[in-house]
Amino acid sequence: MPPSDSPILDDIKSAASELIDPVLDALGGNPWPRRLINACNAAYMISDRRLGSSLPLLEEAGMQKGTRPLVFVSGIHDVHAGFVCRTDDDGLLVTFRGTLPPEDMIFWRWAADWLHDAQTVPMPWTVGERDYGQVASAFGIAVSSLARDLLETLETLNAGSASAIRITGHSKGGAMACLGATLIREQYPDRRIEVCSFAAPMTADQDFIDCYDRDGLLARTDRFQNALDPVPYLPGGPDIRQWLDGEKRLDEAKKLMLVEDAIKALPEWPYRQFGRLHFLHEEDGRIQDDEDAERAAWDAVINAVVKMRFREMIDAHSGVQRYLTALSPDEGEAED
């Protein structure tokens, strides 16, 4: 859970400040990714069906002044959660909470969430009466359990007249954002829907991606991946197995750490990554989103494995200390 004094992003006060902001420049002047990571971090503060002391983060996320977020939860110990709020451009922001961190004050709630995430077997995904491919059951069950409350909340906030509906999440929340987007698209086919995930694991198979594309969602889906973060390669799929099989850099590691046996033992999951990748480089904070970004992200993780930088790989997944910092204009002011 992010601390109450989590580092937050500087306000975007004028067009002039945007011109000298390297993060905004790298994102084509789009302020929403940095707003959305604030929303993701705010979601970790959901407790007792409330958002507690998250107001500063929500203001940074672009929540409309004078409004309040509406929270929805489900599951044992409310392990699945999210919120919807109005934004300052008359849109709506849907945020799904990620997996609770070990620092969560309630041990059983944290344990229940992690055990739920271990359900990686595929399950069919249905939107309306349409077969929508297969998804990882942990995320499918989570979104299905929240669907009714989510759609009722959107109706309460008059989503049909929103300028845009933006959907986001960090980690598990990023996977849920993509699944939730399909249900929201079904309910609001004429609304502009944008999806942005941070550190999302692999979520769905190629049939899902094809349906997602036909619904016009793929072209408006972005995903951010931090250098060294291994979670976007979990729980695995055909692309990952193929990449691992061809990795000569792992030859020594395979001998030392039985990595080769682990690769052979990987289940044949059908999951694939999708959406436009924005890769956050470790050395200079550069944001890469060209055709070579996938390779650069993979190289960073494999090199970290070979060098046994496991502690740093765990830290790389943090929404506050890594993703927020990478998208902050003044990195020197954000705690690492």
Task: List PLM regions with ranges.
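Short, flexible loop/turn elements at secondary-structure junctions
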Residues: A43, V73-I76, D88, G98-L100, ...
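Secretory-pathway lumenal glyco-enzymes, predominantly type II signal-anchor Golgi glycosyltransferases
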Residues: N38-N41, I46, P69-F72, V79-F83, ...
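Charge-rich, solvent-exposed alpha-helical interaction surfaces
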Residues: I8-D11, A15, L19-P22, A26, ...
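Lipolytic serine-hydrolase domain surface
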Residues: D205-D336
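Serine-dependent carboxylesterase/thioesterase catalytic core
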Residues: D149-R241
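A conserved cap/lid and substrate-binding interface adjacent to the catalytic center
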Residues: Q64-T168, R185-R192, L217-L218, A296
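A residue-level signal for conserved active-site and pocket-lining positions in enzyme catalytic cores
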Residues: A39, V94, L146, V195, ...
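N-terminal low-complexity, Ser/Thr- and acidic-residue-enriched intrinsically disordered segments
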Residues: P2-D88, R97
